[in-house]
Each structure stands twice: as C-alpha cells, then as structure tokens.
C-alpha cells in the first residue's frame, strides 16, 4: 500500500477495463495514482474527431495528448528511480531487443519482471492465483496488439 502505482487512464477504456481496475485495486490493496489527459476523451473527440489512423502525424499527436503527457506528469510528480512494467519479449519485434533491466526515460531503471514469460505462462500464473484478469483491454495509442504506444521507445 505504501508504493504508488501509476495508471494512465487515457479515457478510451472499455467498461470491462474500468471494472477490472477497480477489482485489482481492491484485491491487491493498491495505492493507485490515476493520471488522465488534460483533455477528456469526449473533449478530444469533439475537437479532433475519432481516434486517428495509425502511423499518421495526427495519431502521434493523439498519443502525446492521451498517454505520453499524463505519463510524463506522473513521472515528474513522483520522480521514481525504478519503473516496473509488464512488458514481455514476445509481444513485438521492438521488445525482443530489450532486457529485464533497461534504462528508461525520466532517469529511471525500467524493470520488466515478466519479460521472459510467455502469454500462456502469464495466464496460468493469473489463473493459479485467482487474480483478476481483463481480456477486453484496448490501448488506442497502440491500435494493434504488436505495436508500441511510445512509452518503451523513449529514452
């Protein structure tokens, strides 16, 4: 409970994801610190339209607004030395070249404890320990399962 857990709520989550977050916080008694974009999802959509097509300057701006800026704010507020994340080496080509310990943005050491696990091993771990799971997660900054949202590529 003493360790702050940062969650960037980009505002485009599914109802199942919001329920999942509530379950996880309650189940694990987390000290969740929620960071949201300065512009809500409804505001963004009203001003800019729907989520932009991938690999466009508009999508890059979208990612900065809804994911990268709130993350930067959280990192500036907490100034952590260590950034724990849940990436795995088998998620995409970019991540295959990373390691369990890497240097990250904001002068952090990124630690990926599940880096060498497969998706099946993670699912077994979750199931064996009766942990809440969310199969309905969608990250609009990635758009597709094997893309990056931008956080891991920043140094």
Language model features with spans:
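Nucleotide-activated chemistry modules centered on ATP-dependent adenylation/adenylyltransferase
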Residues: 1-155
């Amino acid at each position: 409970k003493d360790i702050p857990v940062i969650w960037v709520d980009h505002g485009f989550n599914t109802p199942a994801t919001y329920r999942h977050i509530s379950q996880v916080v309650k189940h694990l008694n987390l000290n969740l610190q929620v960071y949201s974009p300065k512009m809500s999802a409804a505001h963004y959509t009203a001003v800019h339209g729907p989520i932009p097509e991938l690999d466009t300057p508009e999508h890059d701006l979208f990612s900065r607004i809804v994911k990268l800026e709130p993350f930067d704010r959280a990192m500036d507020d907490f100034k952590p030395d260590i950034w724990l994340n849940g990436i795995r080496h088998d998620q995409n080509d970019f991540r295959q070249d990373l390691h369990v310990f890497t240097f990250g943005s904001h002068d952090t050491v990124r630690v990926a404890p599940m880096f060498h696990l497969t998706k099946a091993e993670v699912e077994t771990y979750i199931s064996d320990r009766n942990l809440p799971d969310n199969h309905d997660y969608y990250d609009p900054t990635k758009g597709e399962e094997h893309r990056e949202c931008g956080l891991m590529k920043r140094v």
